[in-house]
Amino acid sequence: MTKEQIIEAVKSMTVLELNDLVKAIEEEFGVTAAAPVAVVGGAGEAAAEKTEFDVELANAGAQKIKVIKVVREITGLGLKEAKELVDNTPKVIKEGASKEEAEEIKAKLEEVGAAVEVK
């Protein structure tokens, strides 16, 4: 299998399939996909402004179908997975988003009647 064929195969996978693939690679090669954690300096240093935000769907509201469509658009999940996420709120739908991206996602979801928190 060529590198291009592997890339095409990965492009066609769902988020859940990609998650399973990452876990299998971690187990097979004894590695981790977690990003290294930076150690914060001394207590005298000023705290840096938060740059990564989690977007949590607190409540789907009355227009659940529209919320599911937006969740699918944001996450790339399949219909079943997006519906399960929306049905089991509160759930984080996007982790590590930039402030701008988090606000954009929040606006899209609130536009269709969902209650959203950016943490």
Curated annotation (Swiss-Prot):
Keyword field: Ribonucleoprotein, Ribosomal protein
Signal sequence region: none
GO-annotated cellular components: cytosolic large ribosomal subunit
InterPro entries found in the cross-reference section: Ribosomal_bL12, Ribosomal_bL12_C, Ribosomal_bL12_C/ClpS-like, Ribosomal_bL12_oligo, Ribosomal_bL12_oligo_N_sf
Pfam family of the protein (one): Ribosomal_L12_N
Transmembrane residue ranges: none
Molecular functions per Gene Ontology: mRNA binding; structural constituent of ribosome
GO biological process: translation
Assembly description: Homodimer. Part of the ribosomal stalk of the 50S ribosomal subunit. Forms a multimeric L10(L12)X complex, where L10 forms an elongated spine to which 2 to 4 L12 dimers bind in a sequential fashion. Binds GTP-bound translation factors.
PANTHER family: 39S RIBOSOMAL PROTEIN L12, LARGE RIBOSOMAL SUBUNIT PROTEIN BL12M
Alphabetized HAMAP family for the sequence: Ribosomal_bL12
Family to which this protein belongs: Belongs to the bacterial ribosomal protein bL12 family.
Free-text function comment from the UniProt entry: Forms part of the ribosomal stalk which helps the ribosome interact with GTP-bound translation factors. Is thus essential for accurate translation.
Protein's UniProt name: Large ribosomal subunit protein bL12
Phylogenetic lineage: Bacteria, Bacillati, Bacillota, Bacilli, Bacillales
